[in-house]
Amino acid sequence: MSYQFHPAAAGEHLDSIAFYESRLVGLGVDYIGEFEATLVRVCAAPMSFPLDSQPDIHKAGLRRFPFNVLYRVVGGVVQILAVSHHRRRPGYWLGRVELGAN
């Protein structure tokens, strides 16, 4: 199964890479590897991850970094709505649900 980013989620992902790389050279690369491993698991079995508070929105946690990938499946494509840090305000991304509708 393929995936696509909501533009704001793509920005969150890129910001996270830059943040970790600025803290320690190579840590951003580690984050990318962990993120990609999570997406491989999500794309292989998207419905196996728990539902978030919203209907049809799933949450997959990165194992090493404090982030969740919030997504839904529409037309056989995983739509990534947010790459959310665990300490960020819950639900800040909810406005993206309608914007990302297809």
Predicted features, each with a name:
Residues 24, 46-53, 88-91:
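Short, charge-rich, low-complexity interaction segments located
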Residues 37, 44-78:
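Basic/aromatic recognition patch in beta-strand/loop cores that engages polyanionic ligands
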